[in-house]
Each structure stands twice: as structure tokens, then as C-alpha cells.
């Protein structure tokens, strides 16, 4: 069974309403047959799960979908089992993966999506779709059991990617931090996914959506820039992906 994923860099662009830039793509991706959506708000920290879920619920209602937030149901495992789509919101990646491990939902979600159920994630929700969360930008505010993610794609994502250099700032750039990761993880690609872009994965095809380019990093290689019309299918070339 093939996987279907829509992995967003971010939820909101400057000057826009929440998830505005992604709404039509989300609707196109889910289609008209999806009715039961499971939403996971575990990345929320400064906001309550309830407040966060209602914010996301409004967006999905506006485009014709209802969903159940996982913290409100009696059995989170049953919710995932019966879901027709899984949506994982952004926030703090370490808190998100901690809660997914703690609730023992990682295997449930992985199995569900591996059997064809659509998965949508933004920011932290895209991070956890990767083999690990090691390319997150977030502060490790909590120690998870493991950095292992859902392993739904065979590459890493760095959401909110920017190659901007802050004047008079001597800290590491994003690219330098990713280079550190690659030294210790030389066999995996990292996709620098700028805000306002997303990756749509269906079967053995992957497509960049948005009006910006992405950057691809691999140990020992020059970073490569890819445009929305470029073929990225090679990123999915892993025997165990499907």
C-alpha cells in the first residue's frame, strides 16, 4: 500500500490568516471522501490543546471537514484506528514526540499511514514524519524517550528553512547546523523547506508546492537548489519506504 503525505513547512505566512496558503492544497489532497479526521495537538505548549484544536478545527470546517482532537476522546488508539486522515499540528517538536512516545501512538500512526491513510503535518508535524526529529529548529524543552520519528519518509526535513544571515550575529547559520547533523548522519538527505512551501507525496512521487525553491543537503556534496517543476522522486528511493 502506498503512502500519501502533505508536509508543510509552516502554518501561516506573514499577513495571512491561519493556514490560509495551504487550505486549497489540503482540500485537494483530502478530497471529498474523507470524513473522519484525527487531529494531534501535542506540539502545543504555550497554548492549551483545546485552544489549539479549536483554531485548527475552524480552518478545516471552512473547507468542509470535521475532526476529533485526540486529547478529547476516550481511546486515542481507537481514534487513529478509525481515522480517514491524520493531521499533526506544529509547535514544539520535542514535546510532540515525547507525547507520541508516552501515549504509544507512534506505531498506530505509522501503520495507519503506511496502509494508505492520508497524513498532513506542518512544522513539527512534518518533523515527526521523518526518520528522526534531529533536524528540528526547536529548543529541547523536554527529554523524549527517543528522537525516533514516524519514519514515513526516508529523508529529513528542516522546516522554516532560511539561508538568511543576521547582521552582527555570531551564532551558527541554519546551514551550519545542518552540516553538523550530516557529519554524524552521512547517509541521509536533508530537505531545507522554506516557509510557504510543502511536499506532496503520493505513491513513488514527490512534488514541491509553493513559489520558492528548496535546498537539498547531503554529506560530502554541495547543497542543491530545486524548483517546483523539478523531479524529486529520487528522495523516495528506499526499499522499505512502501
Curated annotation (Swiss-Prot):
InterPro entries: Class_I_gatase-like, Peptidase_S51, Peptidase_S51_dipeptidase-E. It is found in: Cytoplasm. One of its GO terms (biological process) is proteolysis. GO terms for cellular component: cytoplasm. Keywords: Cytoplasm, Dipeptidase, Hydrolase, Plasmid, Protease, Serine protease. It holds the Pfam family Peptidase_S51. The active site is at 123 (charge relay system), 138 (charge relay system), 160 (charge relay system). It catalyses: Dipeptidase E catalyzes the hydrolysis of dipeptides Asp-|-Xaa. It does not act on peptides with N-terminal Glu, Asn or Gln, nor does it cleave isoaspartyl peptides. Its main location: cytoplasm. Belongs to the peptidase S51 family. Hydrolyzes dipeptides containing N-terminal aspartate residues. May play a role in allowing the cell to use peptide aspartate to spare carbon otherwise required for the synthesis of the aspartate family of amino acids. This is Peptidase E. It comes from Nostoc sp. (strain PCC 7120 / SAG 25.82 / UTEX 2576). The gene is pepE.
Amino acid at each position: 500500500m502506498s503512502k500519501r503525505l502533505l508536509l508543510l513547512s509552516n502554518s501561516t505566512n506573514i499577513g495571512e490568516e491561519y493556514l490560509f496558503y495551504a487550505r486549497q492544497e489540503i482540500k485537494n489532497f483530502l478530497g471529498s471522501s474523507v470524513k473522519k479526521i484525527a487531529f494531534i495537538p501535542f506540539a502545543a505548549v504555550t497554548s492549551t490543546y483545546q485552544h489549539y484544536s479549536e483554531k485548527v478545527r475552524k480552518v478545516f470546517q471552512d473547507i468542509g471537514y470535521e475532526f476529533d482532537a485526540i486529547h478529547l476522546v476516550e481511546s486515542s488508539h481507537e481514534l487513529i484506528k478509525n481515522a480517514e486522515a491524520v493531521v499533526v499540528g506544529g509547535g514544539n517538536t520535542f514535546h510532540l514526540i515525547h507525547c507520541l512516545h508516552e501515549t504509544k501512538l507512534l506505531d498506530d500512526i505509522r501503520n495507519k499511514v503506511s496502509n494508505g491513510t492520508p497524513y498532513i503535518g506542518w512544522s513539527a508535524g512534518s518533523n515527526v514524519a521523518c526518520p528522526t526529529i534531529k533536524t528540528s529548529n526547536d529548543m529541547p524543552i523536554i527529554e523524549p524517550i527517543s528522537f525516533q520519528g514516524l519514519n514515513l519518509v526516508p529523508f529529513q526535513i528542516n522546516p522554516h528553512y532560511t539561508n538568511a544571515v543576521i547582521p552582527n550575529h555570531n551564532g551558527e547559520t541554519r546551514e551550519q547546523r545542518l552540516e553538523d547533523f550530516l557529519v554524524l548522519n552521512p547517509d541521509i538527505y536533508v530537505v531545507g523547506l522554506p516557509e510557504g512551501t510543502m511536499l506532496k507525496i503520493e505513491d513513488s512521487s514527490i512534488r514541491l508546492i509553493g513559489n520558492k525553491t528548496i535546498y537539498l543537503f547531503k554529506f560530502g556534496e554541495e547543497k542543491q537548489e530545486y524548483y517546483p517543476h523539478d523531479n524529486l522522486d529520487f528522495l523516495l528511493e528506499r526499499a522499505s519506504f512502501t
